[in-house]
Amino acid sequence: MPFARVNGVVLHHETRGRPDRPALVFSNSLGTDFRIWNAVVDRLQDRFHIILYDKRGHGLSEATPPPYALADHVSDLTALLDHLGIARAAVVGLSVGGMIAQGFAALHPHRVAALVLSNTAPKIGTEAMWNERIAAVTERGIAAIADAVLERWFTRAFRSPDNPDYVGYRAMLTRTPVEGYAGTCAAVRDADLTESTRALKLPVLCIGGDHDGSTPPDLVRSMAKMIHKAEFRIIENTGHVPCIERPDAVADLIGIFLKDAQYG
């Protein structure tokens, strides 16, 4: 398994697809690892050089002591792409991964060909909400909040104990290191990218899920309206993590958008 020490942290990462094709980076959400993208990547890897990674404190990446800042996650991604020799890429980000993508594009606009911002916003939640969540997971563990989180992630139909995928992704959430989860909650709590995201000037696709309880469609739509010429699409019958519930729709939207942007 590929690991790299970059920016003072060991990151787990993987490349797939075709190294001779344009680079496409995926950044995942809070409480997940890069396996959430598997079904999407399967549909796109013939066209792109895919880069997947577990952000700091998630998956098999090192969980450094919390709290984290969003700038830490952006610097981690920058250093990883430097390590891999990726000078320019399209970046797909989900939730906090979308915030990382926004921050990376604002800091390094010359390195980003296009952005896909899925189920995210420049500002997510309130300080009180994130402080309450940090306290809950620190005192009682992630399992204590898992059911409430998963109600926002997935549709009622998906959230069945008879659905092995649901059971598996619940395990992914609850096995996330508390340090990484709480640290990244602090990063989201303290981040407000409104002004830098408003200033973006590149092809941007914003995706919402009609049953998303974490970043509702209207929040994603508001982000799209503030970005110059950004596109906005809603995926039906999905919650906060459409790459799991509707990977076909996500891959189709990404593929068409990047083709229209003349990338890949």
Identify the meaning behind each predicted range.
Residues 125-128, 139-198:
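Conserved alpha/beta-hydrolase catalytic His-Asp/Glu region
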Residues 200, 206-208:
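Short beta-strand/loop motif that positions the catalytic acidic residue
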Residues 230-264:
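Catalytic active-site module of serine/aspartate enzymes centered on a nucleophile-bearing elbow/loop
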Residues 210-215:
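Acidic catalytic loop of the alpha/beta-hydrolase fold
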